[in-house]
């Protein structure tokens, strides 16, 4: 393996001589200069990326520090201003220095309770200003139902208001006939709510219930109910009231049937409901 000798040129700089020797050594030992240059460029790019990351991180941290300092300054300024507001004024302005001062409105509030009562007696406006709770109580009393009831007559100058009705007094007892009539009316109203009626005879309840249609002049379903009465079967047909039915108020209490006939040895009574 033959090695080439590198001549030193005194006219060239030291860096150029080193580069020449490095290229000669790489060629002597079989290294590819293109690969070396590629690796060198990659190293430079990595260093550039790291520099950019460091700069961005430092910039973010500096922004955070700057914001924190500004926030601390705002807090200090706010606390100092609130403390200044809490401190009472040691040297109040005189009446001549105030822009809207006058002898009528420049009233000094007394410190003793006797003077306060005197002010309240002379001017109720000042007392109301000193005690706002009394004004709230007065407003609440004015809004109460009794006060409203009394105010209606006092405003219109109608004199003494009449007494309110008392619900504790006993009402006048109604006669027995009116009670029976109202009870009968209630019974009829209750019967209107039912479609099926139960016919009772000698404590025997109707047992069979079925739906059939009889008599063409009735346009609704008829409910068939059978019961024993004096060893004879009595059939009661309960009919849903329609516009074509005969309006008979007495039929609501099953006193007068609308129709009677005999069918297969059974007595049939038709009552609308």
Swiss-Prot record:
Pfam families: Dbl7
GO cellular component, one term: nucleus
Biased composition (Basic residues): 1-10
Composition-biased stretches (Polar residues): 12-24, 55-64, 92-124
Alphabetized UniProt keyword annotations: Cytoplasm, Cytoskeleton, Nucleus, Phosphoprotein
Chief subcellular location: nucleus
Taxonomic source organism: Schizosaccharomyces pombe (strain 972 / ATCC 24843) (Fission yeast)
InterPro entries: Dbl7
Annotated region described as Disordered, given as residue ranges: 1-32, 50-124
Cellular compartments annotated: Nucleus; Cytoplasm, Cytoskeleton, Spindle
Residue positions where Phosphoserine is found in the record: 123
Record-given protein name: Uncharacterized protein C651.12c
TM ranges: none
The keyword Cell membrane belongs to this UniProt entry's keyword annotation: no
